[in-house]
UniProtKB/Swiss-Prot annotation:
Compartments, record wording: Cytoplasm
Keyword Metal-binding applies: yes
Binding residues for a divalent metal cation: D8, D9, S38, N89
Annotated organism of origin: Nostoc sp. (strain PCC 7120 / SAG 25.82 / UTEX 2576)
Domain of life: Bacteria
Catalytic activity: a ribonucleoside 5'-phosphate + H2O = a ribonucleoside + phosphate
Protein name as it appears in the record: Putative 5'-nucleotidase alr3139
Lineage summary: Bacteria, Bacillati, Cyanobacteriota, Cyanophyceae, Nostocales
Length: 226
């Protein structure tokens, strides 16, 4: 069974290295964007060539979006892909974030082709540093649970890790529903220019939703569909 690893932060980002650490010992191929693609959503490339750089037998840097990476991985790199993992994103992809997230788009694209997948993101609190070793540990625990759970066709998992401080209680895995409340749409205006200043951590949230679960220190797991 071949697992494809991808992300939207780029192939050299620390998050995808932590993801590789989480699946150490499994048969995986990294097929990830050559450059940063955060916030690209489900964009695909159809009007220009997509350059592929083979770094090794199991690592490919692709000059495209996360969805492009999955399309190329499952049609050109391996015919035996059984699972797609996307992440670990440096920042949350909670609730309605899924619609603009390249991280989530990668596993949505996989689901469209009948391949199961998990998107993993790490909420960041107040621009504090990430502990990628800890993120890899949590991700391994999550995948131990999810890789063996059946998924109906067209469904996929979206996981968000909390941002905890040393000594805080170990997070629980909580299966929940995605929050449908919007992201803050606040802007600073300078002449004809609008600068986004919405504060992610101050977004509204429905009690018990993925935003609420993650913001209160637990691992939020939602099942989404195409």
């Amino acid at each position: 069974m071949t697992i494809i690893l991808t992300n939207d932060d780029g192939i050299d980002a620390p998050g995808i290295k932590a993801l590789a650490q989480a699946v150490s010992g499994k048969n995986f191929i990294v097929a990830a964007p050559r450059d940063h693609q955060s916030g690209c959503g489900h964009q695909v490339t159809t009007t220009r060539p997509i350059n592929l750089q083979r770094r090794s037998d199991s690592e490919y840097a692709i000059a495209g979006t996360p969805a492009d990476c999955i399309r190329i991985a499952i049609t050109q790199i391996s015919q035996d892909v059984k699972f797609v993992l996307s992440g670990i994103n440096a920042g949350g992809n909670l609730g309605v974030d899924a619609y603009i997230s390249g991280t989530v788009a990668a596993v949505r694209e996989a689901a469209m082709h009948g391949i199961a997948g998990v998107a993993i993101s790490h909420y960041r609190k107040a621009k504090q540093n990430f502990d990628w070793e800890l993120a890899a540990k949590w991700t391994a625990e999550v995948l131990e649970e999810l890789l063996h759970r059946p998924l109906e066709p067209g469904y996929f998992w979206n996981v968000n890790l909390p941002h905890l401080q040393p000594g805080e209680t170990q997070p629980e895995l909580v299966f929940c529903q995605p929050c449908t409340k919007p992201l803050p749409a606040n802007y600073r205006i300078d002449g004809d220019d609008f600068y986004y200043v919405g504060e992610y951590g101050k977004r509204e949230r429905t009690p018990g939703s993925d935003v609420d679960v993650c913001f209160t220190g637990n691992i939020a797991i939602t099942q989404l569909r195409v």
